[in-house]
Design a protein with these regions (language model features):
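A short, exposed helix-loop element centered on a Lys and neighboring polar residues
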Residues: 126-127, 171
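Substrate-binding pocket helix/loop in short-chain dehydrogenase/reductase
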Residues: 101-103, 110-112
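Conserved glycine-rich Rossmann-like NAD(P)H-binding loop of the short-chain dehydrogenase/reductase
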Residues: 33-49
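The beta1-alpha1 cofactor-binding region of Rossmann-like NAD(H)/NADP(H)-dependent oxidoreductases
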Residues: 44-45, 65-77, 108
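C-terminal helical subdomain
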Residues: 186, 205-261
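Catalytic loop of short-chain dehydrogenase/reductase
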Residues: 140-165, 170-171, 175-178, 191-192
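Conserved glycine-rich cofactor-binding loop
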Residues: 12, 19-20
Length: 279
């Protein structure tokens, strides 16, 4: 059974990293179900453009520039939502991918950048939202997982390990929030065709290993709008988590995408690989 129209009417939802790609699609999905959405990213211009776009689509939207690695920014984002009357849903979506290549030669500043966004940003969002939720006796916190959340991934250690951390962090929050009325969810959207996936930086000598990425995305990738839909089921139920790429979906989507011609070169996702200059 589908959701009743306007199932989120009267609720206020914050989505971090939401001025494009998956985050914007999540904000749109929530807004179409009646929620007032607060979008955020590190670019004030991008926030303004996203708010304007959502409003043109009939979504009640507000926004604020926010670097999730800065606690003060995240607190201000929370206050932006509370200024609209309430805070009911918080989605920690902001994420960063690292330079492709072995950990032994990964630039320290790049590893730190990924950890700052994926780990510290998720903690900050959870830290400011949960006290509000616990105080009012309800609320939905959603943390976004990713490739590596269930095991090691060679040559993507910063990103994969950070997502493994997000999974354990989320499962711990769920234990701590038991019987409080607060629901904590995890969402692994699978392969989403976004700018982050289509623009990759590689260490020298490893760029050739990315040649198959377009084929993988052609088989199992999906649009941001499709990837965002399961969010609605999470925030309207007690479901703990959603994982897109199960064995079943890999078979069914793979067959469907092959038949749809997604593996043809003309239909593949554009891929831009930048080789890191180590000179």
């Amino acid at each position: 059974m589908g959701l009743q129209r306007d199932a989120l009417r009267g609720r206020v939802a914050v989505v971090t990293g939401s001025t494009r790609g998956l985050g914007l699609a999540m904000a749109r999905q929530l807004g179409r179900q009646g929620a007032t959405v607060v979008v955020a990213s590190r670019s004030a211009g991008d926030v303004e453009a996203a708010v304007e776009q959502l409003r043109s689509e009939g979504v009640a939207a507000s926004g604020r520039r926010c670097d999730t690695g800065e606690l003060a920014d995240v607190e201000a984002l929370r206050d932006e939502a509370l200024g609209l009357g309430t805070l009911d849903i918080w989605v920690n979506n902001a994420g960063a991918s690292g330079v492709f290549g072995p950990t032994a030669s990964t630039p320290a500043d790049d590893f730190t950048r990924v950890v700052r966004t994926n780990i510290l940003g998720t903690f900050h969002g959870s830290r400011v939202a949960l006290p509000v939720f616990l105080g009012q006796g309800h609320g939905d916190l959603v943390n976004v997982y990713g490739h590596g959340d269930q095991g090691p991934v060679a040559l993507q250690n910063a990103y994969a390990s950070s997502k493994r951390w997000v999974r354990q962090f989320t499962e711990t929050l769920r234990l701590e929030s038991k019987d409080t009325g607060v629901r904590v969810h995890g969402l692994n959207p699978g392969l989403v065709m976004t700018d982050m996936l289509g623009h990759v930086t590689s260490q020298p000598g490893y760029e050739h290993r990315l040649r198959g990425l377009q084929v993988v995305v052609g088989l199992w990738g999906q649009s941001p709008d499709d990837a965002a839909r399961p969010l609605l089921a999470l925030v309207t139920s007690d479901t703990a988590e959603f994982r897109d790429l199960t064995k079943t979906t890999m078979v069914t989507r793979g067959v469907r995408n092959v038949l749809a011609g997604r593996l043809r070169r003309a239909n593949r996702m554009p891929l831009d690989v930048t080789v890191l200059d180590t000179r």
